[in-house]
Amino acid sequence: MNIENAYDQLNAWINTSNGSYIDIGGERYSFSRLKTITKDELSNFESDNNLKLPNDYKSFLINVGCVNIFVGEKTAGIEIIPPTDIRNFSKSVFYNFGDDLYPRLLLTTSIPKLGYFGGFWMESESKENYGIFYPDIPPELWIEECDFIKFDDWLIKLVKYKSRKI
């Protein structure tokens, strides 16, 4: 599976589900598109905020959008957050936990049932700059404890894993 296949699969699930539960790989999930994003909107956001968003995040937003995916009947799923919400989301995550790492860390993903967050470490020179951060690790240790990967690779693994038949 490549990233285009993952985008196509997610879009198919979103269009089929439209917020209702559908059977995926032996589980029932709902999928919904919260917002579509254009190249112009991303460019304007980058200009207005003097910030360069990661290319794989921009590609996801253009091809799939801001979404709530893999929402189970007992789980909250995974939300990919629009760029306009990243700053406030980051403030809420780091509230009472020390320094807000925005814009060095762009938290773009919320996995609320587990208390996980995903984001891009912007100070990395590598394309492997996306990580999932866990609540049992103090935020001040997130960067040094994280095994960073490419966002596209994370997304492909997620789609493949969730769609496998049990």
From Swiss-Prot:
InterPro entries: Knr4/Smi1-like_sf. It comes from the Bacteria. Coiled coil: none annotated. Disruption phenotype: A double rhsB-rhsIB deletion is outcompeted by wild-type cells, restoration of rhsIB restores normal growth in competition experiments. Restoration of growth requires the RhsB-specific immunity protein, rhsIA does not restore growth. Transmembrane segments: none annotated. Immunity component of a toxin-immunity protein module, which functions as a cellular contact-dependent growth inhibition (CDI) system. Specifically inhibits its cognate toxin RhsB. Cell contact is necessary for growth inhibition. This is Immunity protein RhsIB. It comes from Dickeya dadantii (strain 3937) (Erwinia chrysanthemi (strain 3937)). The lineage of its organism: Bacteria, Pseudomonadati, Pseudomonadota, Gammaproteobacteria, Enterobacterales. The gene is rhsIB.
